[in-house]
Amino acid sequence: MTSLVLLRHGQSQWNLEDRFTGWVDVDLSPAGEAEARRGGELIAAAGLEFDRAYASVLTRAIRTADLALAAAGQLWIPMQKDWRLNERHYGGLTGLNKTETAARHGAEQVMIWRRSYDIPPPPLAPGGPFDFAADRRYAGVEVPATETLKSTLERVRPYWDGAIAPRLRAGERLLIAAHGNSLRAIVKLLFEVSDAAIPGVEIPTGNPLVIELDRAQRPTAAHYLDTARAQALPSA
């Protein structure tokens, strides 16, 4: 049996501004920094230790991992960063204010783009300020023009199978600092959540989700360390 902790990055500046962020490399807000440190303090208080950490290649996830691990006294552990743990790409919605977008397109349509499992937002036009094709982080990667939760899962799964799952099988204790949708994809894999149910699974920012796994990597228990900000979980 081993443990896995999922940590959604703390509030980012664009979370604060209520903008669709996706792959844009926005930093944490001051409140988000405090959330990340608090997550690390909760990890320390729970006596959790890690052998390795994982993060996306986006600053808000990397800094969340760093701040949490520093607060937990474990900043020294190795950390692997990979684009496949990035947030879902919001396509043509990237950078837009969510409230203003709902006023323009209708709240129901925007909710479909945000929460449906397999209906994508409009694609991002190439060559604009949020075209990541030339970003060195994605050298050799076919950068998507838009993504759904389903396509996010399809890129997370190979990384999970090839990089993360073998470490868990070896008994390593892991921290994954990532994003609402990439972590939702991992929860779907582990708990076998249905396509219909997974859009309703919420993962709060900066609140460590501890998942105990058996030797077959099936969840046996799961809980948030900050119970006051916990969200409902699939049955373990």
Label each residue range with its predicted role.
Residues 55-56, 176-178:
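Short beta-strand segments
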Residues 39-129, 188-212, 216-219, 234-236:
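Phosphate-coordination/substrate-recognition cap region in phosphate-metabolizing enzymes
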